[in-house]
């Protein structure tokens, strides 16, 4: 199974085991005082003892997340180019969207022509019923984890267990990185104090520390981050995930791989019948 997204916190940094130091306090869920601490060694920043998580996850998707659809569209367009031009997908591989929420990204990627599947232990599959991933299907070429890392208490465990579950050696994910000192509480929207669901934050060096710990290479460009056992040219990744290429990628890829929209529709009708 995929690792727990939220759970208990240890004393030291879960990324590098270094000491954590207090950096600021803020109110979460409009009622709980939370302390935030940072690791000077790797830059990992987290909420200390997030005891409010059960309350924060009464709904897996926060009601205030009005940008969910637009972000999925943007990420799917970038992923189409990454899978086709960077990983060389030509229609034979299978993919998993871990912690896939309602299934929106999986549906979009199948519409583009990729054989994508879904898994999420905290959310119901609303949009791609019948396309839940099972290890018996065989190893995935890659696994995605979109907007997951900021919810984790132990990112290393999540990476390891997700790759083991999927059989993949490449994990493509998104999370907003910060640069330099931890941003002031009032200056960074990504803390998302009102929802209480974002509890861990990363720098580029945090990702590099995780990669070294797990024996994986790290690549990052335009908000797309990759852990992989293969080296990925960041200059190519930057081009493929850039504005102009990512806008054209869905159209290009769909024409070459063939959309699964209608074939999935027919499959669902067969199951109903």
Regions found by a protein language model. Give the residues of each.
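Short glycine-dipeptide loop
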Residues: 166-171
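Di-metal (Zn2+ and/or Mg2+/Mn2+) metal-binding site signature of metallo-dependent hydrolases
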Residues: 151-155
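Conserved N-terminal segment of class I S-adenosyl-L-methionine
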Residues: 1-142, 146, 156-165, 187, ...
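Residues lining the SAM
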Residues: 146-149, 174
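Short, glycine-/aromatic-enriched active-site segment of Class I SAM-dependent methyltransferases
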Residues: 174-200, 205-206, 210-212
């Amino acid at each position: 199974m995929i690792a727990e997204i939220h759970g208990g916190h240890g004393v030291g940094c879960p990324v590098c085991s270094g000491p954590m130091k207090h950096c600021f306090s803020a109110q979460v869920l409009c009622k709980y005082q939370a302390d935030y601490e940072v690791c000077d060694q790797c830059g990992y920043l987290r909420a200390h003892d997030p005891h409010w998580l059960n309350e924060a996850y009464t709904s897996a998707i926060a009601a205030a997340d009005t940008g969910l659809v637009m972000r999925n569209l943007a990420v799917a367009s970038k992923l189409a180019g990454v899978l086709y031009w960077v990983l060389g997908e030509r229609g034979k591989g299978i993919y998993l969207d871990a912690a896939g929420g309602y299934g929106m990204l999986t549906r979009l990627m199948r519409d583009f022509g990729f054989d994508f599947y879904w898994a999420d232990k905290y959310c119901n599959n609303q949009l791609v019923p019948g396309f839940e991933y099972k290890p018996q299907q065989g190893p995935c070429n890659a696994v995605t984890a979109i907007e997951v890392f900021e919810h984790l208490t132990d990112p290393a465990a999540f990476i390891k267990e997700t790759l083991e579950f999927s059989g993949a050696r490449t994990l493509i994910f998104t999370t907003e990185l910060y640069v330099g000192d931890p941003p002031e509480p009032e200056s960074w929207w990504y803390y998302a104090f009102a929802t209480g669901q974002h509890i861990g934050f990363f720098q580029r060096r945090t990702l590099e520390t995780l990669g070294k710990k797990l024996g994986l290479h790290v690549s990052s460009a335009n908000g797309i981050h990759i852990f992989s056992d293969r080296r990925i040219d960041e200059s190519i990744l930057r081009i493929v995930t850039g504005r102009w290429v990512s806008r054209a990628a869905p159209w290009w890829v769909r024409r070459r791989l063939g959309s699964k929209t209608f074939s999935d529709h027919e499959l669902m009708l067969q199951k109903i019948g």
